[in-house]
Structures are given as C-alpha cells and as structure tokens.
C-alpha cells in the first residue's frame, strides 16, 4: 500500500466575495456580464437587455429564440457587420468564442464558458468573432439572440464553419 499522499495544489480564486469573476474575458470587445435574477412573490424576473450595459451602441433590430437538442452543437459562425447578444434562457449551454480578427490585439485567443439560467449571463459578440454553442445537458437548451441588424434572407451576414472544424482551435465537448 502506498503511503505517499496524492499531489495537491491550492485552488485559485475565480470569483470575488460578491461572486464577480476575477479574470476578464480576454478577447478584445467581447463582453460577458452576469445579470441578477429578481425573486418576487409570483416567481422570478430576469432583465435581458438594457442599453446602459453596453459600451458600444447597440440597437435591437432582430430577436430570435433558438433551441438546441441534447448533445447538439451549432455551426461556428461570425458576422462581418452584425453584432450579437446571446442570452441563454434554458438548459446548460457551453459557448465557445474565438478571435479570428487578424488586426485584433487578442487575435488567436479563445474562451469557453458554461451558462445556465440559475446564474444568468449574456455574451456580447462583436463582428468578426467566431462563436458556437453546445447543449451539454440532458434536456433541450434554449437561448435568445438579439441582433443590431435585421436578418437579410437573400444575403445573410453569416459566415460558417462546421462544429468540428479544425480551423477553430476550440473544443466544446
């Protein structure tokens, strides 16, 4: 029997005492912000959008509700002009973000974050940022996408790669 204790290390701090994240997002112009659930006598209210939350001007022009089946992953996609706000509202969603903008100070950097409605947050995605979402839970997952431009059916500002593309060095599994 081995009497040597297993190697250990102290966990690093990831949030402050009031549960704000320690580390910044790390990708230039991408914003991830927690919003508060407001519990009241008839249930829970969660604000999804306030203009003052955004440093860039963002006028909502189009809104979609997306449902992902368990284990499914959206295509990697980005926009040349359009800005997105992604707000998960149901289930467990892992969001991958990759900066493919060659002129960006954070070119080549990526982040992966997990979202669920118990601790609501949104992601602001500026033009040129690749993003994909994966349902990592056992039930359908849902998210709302707010766009600053209306969807152009004839000429969409959507540039896509398959979920498993090797061009994006991010894994959502």
Go through the PLM ranges and name each one.
Residues 119-124, 129-137:
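Beta-rich strand-turn-strand
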Residues 1-119, 136-173:
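Non-catalytic, conserved peripheral segments adjacent to functional cores
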